[in-house]
């Protein structure tokens, strides 16, 4: 049928109006709100049907079988490093393998651990416990009574959710304590005051949780009392994120600290003195790390001018507790940031502080000790330019463990004795051959001119011909840094098969301190997407890859990031893996823990929506745009980021006639599968998709 120019114009206007109405309807009336009922029959049936179609297609990808088999081998390997945790004179470890799918909690002596063959003693078998009790238990950790190291509160989750059941356990008798402390399923927090007393925050009943779903009331709970008989010592507001009490047990004293967090990176702390709470007069975004040698250790997230002195953001400060309570503000500066050098992490031993920094995103390690009231600092040598992860430190002596790795060097565990040098005690297997691979650090220029660093890992035989399958991973939120580390998954499934891997250090993370983070929050959050887009464009300009061969991947906040990137620039990418993502930013604060992140993104129920609506992925999907065939995956039991975010994105894309892939695991919390085999399968699906789209 032939149309005249006038008729064509009328038809074009009509089509535009229909498209606009569709987008408007998507913004105002959400036809997929029913997907927020996590375990409704309708939602689960929808998820099951599309998940089965996705897995069937991905399992037929030629690379899937080999990648999956390799991941099963890696994740179940008995040659993995058993991460140690000091408690008393012992080292504890939680371990999963094919014989212990749910896992075993075990221990050994330090001397035995440092030998080639470790003599382990099983303390609790979670597989046996789950079978006996008929529960889908997933191990979530333990809180020891630190001065005795016999009794502990064990956290067990049903299906991997953040909410846990907590039960008192006797590590000497290796059994749960009869009539011991017990907390039903909730997002509870506990801290031991003494062997017969806990501070507890939990779901005490109606109106005892914050809008974010965390405890707002802290109570002192004595042995023999029912939970309802516990004594309230502090109440926060429902609009706070959480409130709780933590006890620092130190050789010189015991310190009880009550904290309330009105926002994600803001808190007010009180020192409990007798029955009184004394407010610690600190900036609301400062973090009390702990109390050490009768000194407060304080980390600053913003510049602080007080009593004629100026202390920079990202500094670590110390001051005597008594001096501070008397009004003195003459702080000792233990760390002060420099250009592209930022604070990263801190632990303590009996007499030393151990901290790591990031120097242009690579780790350095330092030890501080007091001598005649002066802090003496020394650097602890590392094998190269990579990443340090402080594993565990002893409070009985000055020993500690740390992990070191880089992109091409498998993770090694080092042990440091009292004031000594690192000794390598365990090394992970090399799961891929790095021969011929290269790593460089480049910079992209973002929209506002800021230089954004990224690591480029090139496979053997690499040529800058714009044809390389390239995967960019980024996160960019909550002050979480992305560091150069060894990944057996990336190496074996991607690099060794000829793919290029990119780790982008975009704003929103903590790679260069708190200011790098705050440069991408709330009204500045578009910066997050601009930085990732800049990295993608830089890779194309350098002929590393082209849009046809370029994929992006992110999870949680990173899932929001990659979702926003492909809705804004669908022309740049041919593959998108969005895992356990946020996406519907109009309703995110009403779903599970979403309200706790409003300091990061904004409150959509206020004028903040005026900027949020410009980048919220769900509201910005359009029937007029051509999108890549994106892949979303999530977990039904994720009780942190609601699975409806991923569900709704997929449903909307389907409504608009777009091809999309989706997988929802019925188990697993926000972190993924509940056991190594589930994690191996889920990871293999992602790489099968990437090879399908980018080869």
Question: Model-found features: residue ranges?
Answer:
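Structured core elements
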Residues: 153, 191, 199, 256-257, ...
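Secondary-structure transition/capping motifs at alpha-helix termini
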Residues: 113-116, 147, 159-161, 171-175, ...
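Cap/lid segment of the alpha/beta-hydrolase catalytic domain
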Residues: 124-145, 156-161, 175, 180, ...
């Amino acid at each position: 049928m032939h149309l005249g120019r006038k008729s064509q114009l009328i038809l074009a206007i009509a089509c535009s109006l229909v498209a606009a109405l569709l987008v408007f309807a998507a913004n105002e009336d959400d036809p997929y709100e029913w997907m927020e009922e996590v375990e409704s029959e309708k939602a689960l049936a929808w998820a099951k049907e599309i998940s089965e179609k996705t897995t069937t297609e991905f399992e037929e990808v030629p690379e899937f079988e080999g990648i999956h088999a390799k991941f099963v081998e890696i994740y179940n390997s008995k040659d993995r490093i058993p991460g140690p945790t000091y408690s008393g004179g012992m080292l504890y470890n939680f371990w999963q393998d094919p014989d212990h799918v749910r896992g075993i909690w075990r221990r050994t002596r330090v001397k035995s651990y440092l030998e080639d063959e470790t003599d382990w003693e099983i303390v609790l078998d979670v597989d046996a416990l789950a079978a006996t009790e008929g529960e889908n238990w997933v191990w979530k950790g333990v809180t020891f009574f630190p001065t005795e190291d016999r009794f502990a509160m064990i956290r067990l989750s049903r299906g991997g959710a953040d909410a846990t059941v907590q039960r008192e356990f006797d590590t000497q008798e290796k059994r749960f304590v009869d009539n011991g402390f017990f907390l039903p399923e909730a997002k509870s927090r506990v801290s031991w005051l003494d062997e017969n007393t806990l501070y507890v925050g939990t779901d005490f009943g109606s109106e005892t949780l914050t809008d974010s779903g965390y405890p707002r009331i802290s109570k002192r709970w004595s042995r023999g009392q029912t939970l309802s008989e516990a004594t309230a010592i502090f109440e926060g507001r429902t609009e706070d994120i959480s409130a709780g009490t933590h006890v620092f047990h130190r050789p010189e004293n015991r310190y009880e600290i009550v904290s309330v967090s009105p926002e994600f990176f803001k808190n007010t702390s009180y020192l409990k003195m007798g029955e009184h709470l004394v407010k610690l007069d600190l900036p609301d975004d400062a973090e009390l790390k702990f109390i050490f040698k009768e000194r407060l250790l304080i980390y600053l997230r913003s510049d602080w001018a007080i009593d004629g002195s100026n202390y920079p953001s990202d500094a670590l400060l110390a001051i005597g507790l008594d001096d501070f309570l008397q009004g003195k503000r003459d702080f000792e500066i233990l760390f002060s940031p420099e250009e592209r050098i930022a604070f990263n992490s801190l632990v303590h031993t009996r007499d030393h502080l151990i901290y790591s920094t990031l120097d242009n995103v690579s780790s350095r390690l330092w030890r501080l000790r007091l001598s005649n009231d002066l802090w003496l600092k020394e650097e602890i040598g590392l094998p190269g330019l990579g990443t340090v992860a402080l594993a565990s430190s002893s409070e009985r002596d000055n020993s500690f463990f740390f992990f070191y790795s880089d992109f091409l060097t498998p993770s090694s565990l080092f042990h440091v004795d009292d004031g000594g040098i690192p000794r390598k005690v365990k090394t992970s297997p090399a799961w891929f051959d790095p021969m011929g691979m290269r790593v460089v650090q480049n910079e992209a220029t973002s929209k506002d001119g800021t230089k954004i660093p990224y690591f480029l890992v090139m496979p053997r035989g690499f040529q800058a011909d714009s044809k390389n399958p390239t995967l960019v991973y980024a996160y960019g939120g909550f002050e979480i840094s992305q560091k150069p580390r060894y990944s057996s998954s990336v190496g074996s499934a991607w690099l060794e098969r000829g793919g290029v891997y990119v780790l982008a250090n975009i704003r929103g993370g903590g790679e260069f301190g708190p200011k790098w983070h705050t440069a991408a929050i709330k009204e500045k959050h578009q910066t997050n997407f601009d930085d990732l887009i800049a990295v993608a464009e830089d890779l194309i300009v350098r002929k590393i890859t082209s849009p046809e061969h370029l994929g992006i991947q992110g999870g949680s906040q990173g899932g929001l990031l990659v979702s926003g990137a492909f809705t804004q620039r669908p022309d740049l990418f041919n593959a998108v893996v969005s895992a356990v993502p946020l996406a519907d930013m109009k309703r995110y604060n009403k779903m599970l823990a979403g309200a706790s992140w409003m300091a990061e993104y904004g409150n959509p129920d206020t004028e903040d929506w005026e900027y949020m609506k410009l980048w919220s992925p769900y509201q910005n999907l359009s029937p007029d745009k051509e999108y890549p065939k994106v892949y979303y995956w999530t977990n039904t039991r994720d009780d942190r980021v609601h699975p409806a975010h991923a569900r709704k994105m997929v449903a909307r894309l389907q409504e608009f006639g777009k091809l999309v892939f989706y997988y929802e695991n019925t188990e697993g919390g926000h972190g993924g599968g509940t056991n190594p085999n589930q994690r191996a399968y889920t990871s293999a699906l992602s790489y099968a998709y990437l090879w399908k789209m980018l080869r």
